[in-house]
């Protein structure tokens, strides 16, 4: 996955494998943290956007689909949602969605790069919203791999892996060893959720993520939707559980609690998204 970022007459373009995706606007900030290159860009169409290592990560007016689709299939379906672990998620969007549920008592958000949090709070405050001041959110500026490795068994009801593409500091978040550790610290009846790349632009990576999850968990399935600032626009999330698939059947009480506060996700949307599998991907998934 080799990315390049270029500017041209008021545009910022991400280049990858012969494809260019650009937004018109202006550059606000560009710096390097100890872990990655961070860019903040103000686009005319989607508002302020965050890029990591020259990849579009999130933008104010296009982030709802990504965050709602990563969080709610897991939290609406898990047996309990008292204790949540988020790996990554430094923009605050995943925490914001989790905190819509009154049942949630504690969220450990483990982000390796403090600058991602600081710059998101300063330049993209609407994404995290009130999550940053919620007493249920515990920020841990640490390595997520190490955090999971040293956490005791059955610690979390839901685990959310909200990492970037499998390059740089996020690469190991897709490894067999890390996901096995996630299974170990997930409580019975719990659900794991992860972003799982574009099935069109990164088909091999997407299939491999689902394959690893199915090797480790009894049940694992991808779900598909649209995220306009990502390569090809077609994106995926994968969900895993040790119980017959917990992530497909939302609890009615939770649906009622959060549905009016969602822009994309709904119970009907979730059911459709799990069944709307591109034919070429379905054939590949049948092989694993």
Swiss-Prot record:
GO terms for biological process: spermidine biosynthetic process. It catalyses: S-adenosyl 3-(methylsulfanyl)propylamine + putrescine = S-methyl-5'-thioadenosine + spermidine + H(+). It comes from the Bacteria. The keyword Oxidoreductase does not apply. Pathway: Amine and polyamine biosynthesis; spermidine biosynthesis; spermidine from putrescine: step 1/1. Keywords: Cytoplasm, Polyamine biosynthesis, Spermidine biosynthesis, Transferase. S-methyl-5'-thioadenosine binds at residues 36, 111, 143-144, 169. The active site is at 162 (proton acceptor). GO terms for molecular function: spermidine synthase activity. Spermidine binds at residues 67, 91. It is an enzyme of class 2 (transferase). GO terms for cellular component: cytoplasm. Its EC number is 2.5.1.16. It is found in: Cytoplasm. The keyword Metal-binding does not apply. Belongs to the spermidine/spermine synthase family. Catalyzes the irreversible transfer of a propylamine group from the amino donor S-adenosylmethioninamine (decarboxy-AdoMet) to putrescine (1,4-diaminobutane) to yield spermidine. HAMAP family: Spermidine_synth (MF_00198). Homodimer or homotetramer. This is Polyamine aminopropyltransferase. It comes from Prochlorococcus marinus (strain NATL1A).
